[in-house]
């Protein structure tokens, strides 16, 4: 049975359960005998599916992604890069830690007019309920940075976004204190980062990776929301739940649009296996990270859209922002052990559905090194 047919059958079964119980969602009483063998000690949590983007350069992609979200009742989290809000002519106004003034691994924002449009896209996204989070500035690998380096990077991000460098920043409808999430460029984190984040009032970080069924933990006052380590269905290659890593695993980070449909199907199938394992298992949040790039002919952006359409309207699924997830885990932080163990009445797992314990892929096998990752965002507009 294909994943498409399997999930369609599952959806029909859940709908039948809901109708039988005169409810809009499956009830725990209805499926108590068919679900988990864990003792039910807490209420079944929603299945969070977090869909996020790194980058923010490509203006048409801003509009396309917002339109898709509006049509499909979901919210994105946008991790934005500060240098895309600095005009080319003002690049000396940014001093990257250990790199010096006027240096960026991903280029700059273009003209003042282009930057004004980009600020407006940020404002519109926030006004529509999407979350704006930080991807730092120059897209440098910070894995060796000190606390002082990170402090400088965060301070410059706030100045760029809310005061302006080379242009005057407009009012965005939110302020620096409303930016509470971070993903390190190249996922390059260091001990200095995790000392800096709580001091800057950040609530969560998404720079690490972990098993697909991991429930978030709070470390040093900051929630850990890691990307998942997965096997690509169809090739068995290792990847993170991020489009760039699929791109490297599929075609070594080189364009190969001729195989677009294969890559698209494999990503959909992989994300569906990730979803099914958790949805019918311990309900650990799904973390999916993409970029404003249409690599391999748009295979990965199309796959993300197809996946979102398939799951975001399902019972007990919440395709929200990381801020939504923060609220839930804060309210349930004393239940983290039970959530990780799946100590609630789980939905019956259909025959053929992905296992509740996907293989924990060794991080050393993941395709996409920091060096490969360094320049990928610079080509957002052209991929």
Predicted features along the sequence, with ranges:
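C-terminal domain-boundary segment and adjacent tail
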Residues: 40-41, 204-216, 269-383
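Active-site-adjacent pocket scaffolds in enzyme catalytic domains
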Residues: 95-105, 109-111, 170-180, 184-282, ...
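Bacterial N-terminal signal peptides that target proteins for export
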Residues: 1-11
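C-terminal motif of bacterial Sec signal peptides marking the signal peptidase cleavage site
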Residues: 19-21
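An active-site-proximal "capping" alpha-helix that borders the catalytic cofactor pocket
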Residues: 150-164
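Active-site beta->alpha N-cap acidic-glycine motif
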Residues: 39-131, 138-141, 160-194, 211, ...
């Amino acid at each position: 049975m294909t994943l498409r047919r399997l999930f369609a059958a599952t959806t029909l079964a859940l709908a039948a359960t809901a109708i039988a119980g005169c409810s809009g969602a499956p009830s725990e009483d209805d499926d108590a005998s068919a679900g988990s063998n864990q003792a039910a000690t807490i209420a079944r949590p929603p299945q969070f599916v977090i869909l996020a983007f790194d980058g923010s350069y490509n203006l048409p992609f801003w509009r396309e992604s917002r339109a898709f979200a509006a049509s499909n009742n979901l919210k994105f989290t946008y991790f934005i890069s500060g240098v895309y809000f600095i005009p080319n002519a003002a690049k000396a106004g940014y001093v990257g830690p250990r790199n010096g003034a006027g240096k960026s691994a991903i280029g700059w924002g273009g003209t003042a007019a282009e930057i004004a449009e980009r600020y407006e896209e940020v404002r519109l996204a926030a006004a529509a309920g999407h979350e704006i989070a930080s991807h730092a500035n120059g897209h440098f690998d910070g894995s060796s940075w000190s606390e002082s380096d990170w402090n400088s990077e965060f301070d410059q991000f706030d100045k760029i976004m809310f005061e302006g460098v080379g242009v005057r920043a407009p009012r965005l409808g939110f302020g620096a204190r409303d930016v509470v999430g971070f993903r390190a460029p190249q996922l390059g984190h260091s001990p200095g980062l995790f000392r800096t984040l709580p001091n800057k009032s950040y609530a969560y970080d998404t720079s690490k990776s972990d098993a697909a069924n991991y429930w978030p933990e709070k470390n040093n006052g900051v929630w850990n929301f890691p990307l998942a380590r997965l096997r690509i269905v169809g090739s068995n290659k290792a990847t993170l739940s991020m489009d760039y890593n699929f791109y490297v695993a599929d075609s070594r980070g080189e364009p190969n649009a001729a195989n677009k449909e294969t890559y698209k199907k494999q990503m959909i199938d992989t994300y569906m296996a990730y979803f099914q394992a958790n949805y019918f298992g311990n309900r650990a949040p799904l973390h999916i990270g993409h970029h404003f790039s249409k690599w391999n002919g748009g295979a990965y952006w199309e796959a993300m859209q197809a996946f979102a359409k398939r799951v975001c309207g399902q019972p007990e699924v919440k395709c929200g922002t990381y801020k939504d997830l923060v609220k839930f885990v804060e309210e349930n932080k004393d239940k983290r052990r039970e959530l990780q163990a799946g100590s609630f009445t789980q939905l019956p797992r259909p025959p053929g559905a992905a296992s509740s314990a996907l293989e924990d892929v060794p991080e050393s096998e993941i395709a996409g090194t920091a060096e490969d990752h360094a320049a990928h965002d610079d080509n957002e507009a052209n991929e």
